[in-house]
Amino acid sequence: MPSLKDLKNRIASVKATQKITKAMKMVAAAKLRRAQEAAEAARPYSQRMAAVLANIAQAVGADDSAPRLMTGTGRDDTHLVIVCTAERGLCGGFNSQIARFARDHVRKLLAQGKTVKIICVGKKGFDMLRRDFASLIIDRVDLREVKKIGFENADRIGHKVIELFDKGEFDVCTLFYSEFKSVISQIPTAQQLIPASAGEVAAAEGEGASAIYEYEPEAGAILSDLIPRNISVQIFRALLENVAGEMGAKMSAMDNATRNAGEMIDKLTLSYNRQRQAQITKELIEIISGAEAL
């Protein structure tokens, strides 16, 4: 049984931890508001760009003027998987959900005899995936020093992906990230970037993608410029969604930790009081016994 001093020290330690988790919850809540605003602001632009891309792709079809980023290589032998997670932990199961979702996809591809290459955006996803797929990871994007995610961060990743595609390094590229729904709900999501699937995008964007436009210059030339930018835009949106999801998960995790610390303090305080009461009672009995002996 721990002594009164041990219990007192443990209560003080848990109280100190509770102060830290409470402060982290408040910081995450403040960051969440800004991250949520950024993610929600990026959605209409990325969705509209996807709709315009789908419209132009339908106009071009599969003729010779269609860029390879849209039509693909005609094969699906080699897959590039981009996994976006957080750089830090203490956010519940946020990172593990994305990593598990991507891991299942990679295993499915490997079971089908496909070649898989992985780019990890974020330290936590890298740490989790390298346990099983160390030989498949070809690059890791480090964003630890980035205080605020900007389009330039996504654009660098997009250029890297297009460079690999132009070199014939892969046939299909899929982006994995967590779509922010609410503080307690972040949905692991997979989005195909290359080849740009006009049919899927059109279905996702609804009737807005079926409007009729006239293009100047011709549609194929517009697609050649629009698809690379769309890749960067979709990656940018994924990064913003991830930041919002991470902050939401962190706020929820720190709230749970703060409440758990409070419950532990109550239990330890009860144990301390009971033991102190027992010790006082014992001392009183000894005093009374001594007095009676006299």
UniProtKB/Swiss-Prot annotation:
GO molecular function, one term: proton-transporting ATP synthase activity, rotational mechanism
Localization of this protein: Cell inner membrane
BP GO annotations: proton motive force-driven plasma membrane ATP synthesis
InterPro entries, per database record: ATP_synth_F1_ATPase_gsu, ATP_synth_F1_gsu, ATP_synth_F1_gsu_CS
Keyword line: ATP synthesis, Cell inner membrane, Cell membrane, CF(1), Hydrogen ion transport, Ion transport, Membrane, Transport
GO cellular component annotations of the record: plasma membrane; proton-transporting ATP synthase complex
Main location: membrane
Domain of life: Bacteria
PROSITE patterns cross-referenced by the UniProt entry: ATPASE_GAMMA
Membrane topology term: Peripheral membrane protein
PANTHER family given in the database record: ATP SYNTHASE GAMMA CHAIN (PTHR11693), ATP SYNTHASE SUBUNIT GAMMA, MITOCHONDRIAL (PTHR11693:SF22)
Subunit comment: F-type ATPases have 2 components, CF(1) - the catalytic core - and CF(0) - the membrane proton channel. CF(1) has five subunits: alpha(3), beta(3), gamma(1), delta(1), epsilon(1). CF(0) has three main subunits: a, b and c.
Family as reported in the entry's similarity comment: Belongs to the ATPase gamma chain family.
Function: Produces ATP from ADP in the presence of a proton gradient across the membrane. The gamma chain is believed to be important in regulating ATPase activity and the flow of protons through the CF(0) complex.
Name of the protein in question: ATP synthase gamma chain
Organism this protein belongs to: Rhizobium meliloti (strain 1021) (Ensifer meliloti)
